């Protein structure tokens, strides 16, 4: 079947420097899986926290599945992530030591299963964000100016 990307967290790449990424499974209800297959998921403002040796994702919005009338899920409930114990311990150590955070970057379907890509990230300062925007604008201007003449 392959991989089908359902949602990406574009804001994460603007606000954070991504250090490492991990693939995790996620515990979902049936209506949540159907909503994700439709693409009704939003990762903005979501984050991962490790509680009692288990990883949970908070503030991940999964829209209610419209055809399911009676049994609806809470769109913002906390959901358990499925990671190996050594991965959780490694993430816990890095988050406590260096002031890093764990954020979701992508939700995708892999061989029919819903997977989430989480990243160990460090927040960018305001000036770093401004520099990235300036650099992007300069590249865009150069590519417009020399369209087809040089490659960047």
Swiss-Prot record:
Biological process, per Gene Ontology? trans-translation
- Its main localization is cytoplasm
Q: Which domain of life is it from?
A: Bacteria
User: What CDD domains has UniProt attached to this entry?
Assistant: SmpB
Provide the alphabetized UniProt keywords.
Answer: Cytoplasm, RNA-binding
**What cellular-component terms does GO give this entry?**
cytosol
* InterPro entries on file: SmpB, SsrA-bd_prot, SsrA-bd_prot_CS
Record has GTP-binding as a keyword: no
What residue range is the signal peptide?
Answer: none
Q: Kindly list the places in or outside the cell where this protein is found, as annotated in its UniProt entry.
A: Cytoplasm
One GO MF term on file is:
RNA binding
UniProt cross-references to NCBIfam families, sorted A to Z: PRK05422.1, smpB
Role description? Required for rescue of stalled ribosomes mediated by trans-translation. Binds to transfer-messenger RNA (tmRNA), required for stable association of tmRNA with ribosomes. tmRNA and SmpB together mimic tRNA shape, replacing the anticodon stem-loop with SmpB. tmRNA is encoded by the ssrA gene; the 2 termini fold to resemble tRNA(Ala) and it encodes a 'tag peptide', a short internal open reading frame. During trans-translation Ala-aminoacylated tmRNA acts like a tRNA, entering the A-site of stalled ribosomes, displacing the stalled mRNA.
Q: Which family does it belong to?
A: Belongs to the SmpB family.
What's the protein called, per UniProt?
Answer: SsrA-binding protein
Organism of origin is Persephonella marina (strain DSM 14350 / EX-H1)
Question: What are the leading ranks of the lineage?
Answer: Bacteria, Pseudomonadati, Aquificota, Aquificia, Aquificales
């Amino acid at each position: 079947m392959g991989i089908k990307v359902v949602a990406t967290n574009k804001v994460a790449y603007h606000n954070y420097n991504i250090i490492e990424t991990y693939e995790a499974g996620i515990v979902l209800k049936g209506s949540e899986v159907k909503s994700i297959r439709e693409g009704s998921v939003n990762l903005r403002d979501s984050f991962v926290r490790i509680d009692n040796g288990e990883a949970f994702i908070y503030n991940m919005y999964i829209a209610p599945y419209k055809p399911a009338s009676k049994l609806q899920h809470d769109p913002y409930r906390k959901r358990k992530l499925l990671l190996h114990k050594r991965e959780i311990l490694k993430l816990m150590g890095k988050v406590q030591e260096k002031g890093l955070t764990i954020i979701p970057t992508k939700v995708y379907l892999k061989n029919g299963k819903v997977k989430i890509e989480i990243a160990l990230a460090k927040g960018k300062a305001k000036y770093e964000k401004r520099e990235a925007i300036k650099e992007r604008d300069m590249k865009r201007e150069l590519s417009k100016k020399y369209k087809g003449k040089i490659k960047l």
